[in-house]
A protein has these predicted regions:
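Generic structural signal for short, solvent-exposed loop/turn connectors between secondary structure elements
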Residues: 9, 57-59, 207
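Active-site acidic/histidine proton-transfer and metal-coordination neighborhood
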Residues: 13-116, 126
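Histidine-acidic metal/acid-base catalytic patches
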Residues: 31, 40-42, 80, 97-119, ...
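Active-site-proximal loop/turn and secondary-structure-junction residues that shape catalytic pockets
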Residues: 6-11, 50-52, 85-89, 121-123, ...
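Short, structured active-site "lid" loops
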Residues: 1-5
């Protein structure tokens, strides 16, 4: 199984907010929607792109104009297009879809159940915090979740600032039935240490 498919994007920086990439993206996503559906999967990731001096409203409009040209086909094939929320403070400077409020507005304007946001807990803790309330207020727009510890993007245990049992409970209480993917970078160097860290993370998230 695959919780999230990729490969249609150009890059994180060259995304749907820039119209000069629309023709390439439309072709790529049309092809990959077929690949994903034919393989029996459901989710396909996308990215906003960098601002490059662009204001939020222009970016929203451009994303809507481009994504509307593939969403109908995604609906027909039963594929969910998901834009990842990434922090622009540390890891992906200048990335446009760096706040829930911007991403949620994009979802509202597209008005499709086949377009949602990939809520990366690590990234959103860095850029906006208020994780649990944000999830409770906007869960209907989130189709996938990523984990990692803050700071450092390492294990999600008590070596970092987020209390994952409460966050996972909020996700579960929202009625979410999709995937939560462990995306942290283990601090251990040996394979056994990495497997141990993953098992611990799964246990932490088993509420």
């Amino acid at each position: 199984d695959s919780s999230m498919c990729n490969g249609a994007e150009i890059s994180l920086t060259k995304g749907w907010n820039h119209t000069e990439y629309h023709s390439t993206l439309i072709k790529n996503y049309t092809d990959h929607i077929n690949y994903v559906a034919d393989a029996g999967y459901k989710n396909l990731i996308c990215f906003s792109g960098s601002r490059d001096g662009m204001d939020d409203e222009t970016g929203l409009k451009n994303c809507v104009d481009g994504l509307k040209q593939i969403i109908g086909f995604a609906e027909k094939r039963g594929v969910m297009i998901q834009m990842e929320l990434l922090n622009s403070k540390i890891d992906h400077k200048d990335y446009m879809c760096d706040r829930s409020v911007w991403g949620v507005e994009l979802c509202k304007r597209l008005g499709s159940e086949n377009f949602k946001l990939l809520y990366d807990i690590y990234h959103m803790q860095i850029d906006e915090g208020d994780v649990i309330r944000t999830i409770k207020n906007n869960h209907q727009y989130y189709g996938h979740y990523h984990t990692a510890g803050v700071p450092g993007r390492h294990e999600i245990d008590d070596t970092q600032e987020l209390f994952y049992p409460a966050i996972i409970k909020a996700i579960s209480d929202s009625g979410f039935k999709g995937y939560l993917a462990q995306e942290f970078i283990p601090t251990g160097k040996e394979k056994e240490d990495k497997i141990k860290a993953l098992k611990k993370a799964v246990k932490i998230c088993d509420i």
